[in-house]
C-alpha cells in the first residue's frame, strides 16, 4: 500500500470512530471528547492485576507512567528493527528506502508499493506481538482486559522456541494469575514474570521470512530442483 493508501485507510478508521460517537458528539461533545480520549487517566490501584506489587504512591506517579511509555516505545522499535523488518535491512533502512528515490512530496505520496505479499503468519505475528508488548507495559490491567490478549496467547507461545511443556506451564500460570481475585502482590509479580518470559521467548526466536510470494516461489524452485536430481 502506498503512503496515500495508508492515509486514506487511517481516515476510514477515524470515520468509523466519528460515526459511532455521533449520538454523544451531538448531545455532549465536550464531555465525550474529554473523557473518551483522556490519556492521563489513572486506574484504581486496588483493581489492577498488573504491577499490583508496586506501592500505590509510586503506581499512580507520572514517573512510572513515563518510564513504562519509554520502555513500551523502545521495545516496539527494537522488535521492528531487528525482527519485523530484518529482511528489509532494519526499520531505518526500510524507511530510508521509501524516501530515497522520491524527488518530491507528490512523488513520495503517489509512489506505488512493491509487489510483495506479506505472509499471513507474519501479519498475525506482528499484530499479536505488538499488542502483547503493550500488555506487558500497561501500568494497570483490570480483569476485563484479559480479553485483549487471551486469544493470542497460544499463538504467541507457539512462536517461541520453548519446549511444549514450558509453553503449557506459562499458559497455565498466566491463567491462574488472572483468576486470583482480588489480585495480590505475589500474583501480580508472577504475572509480570510470565509476561517477560514469554516476551524473551518471542525475542530469542528466529525472525521469520515475511513475504509469501517469494517464499512460495523459493519452495517451488527447491521442489523442482529436488525432482530433477
What are these regions (language model features)?
Residues 42-60:
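Juxtamembrane membrane-water interface segments that cap and precede transmembrane helices
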Residues 1-37, 41, 62-229:
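Multi-pass membrane glycosyltransferase architecture that uses lipid-linked
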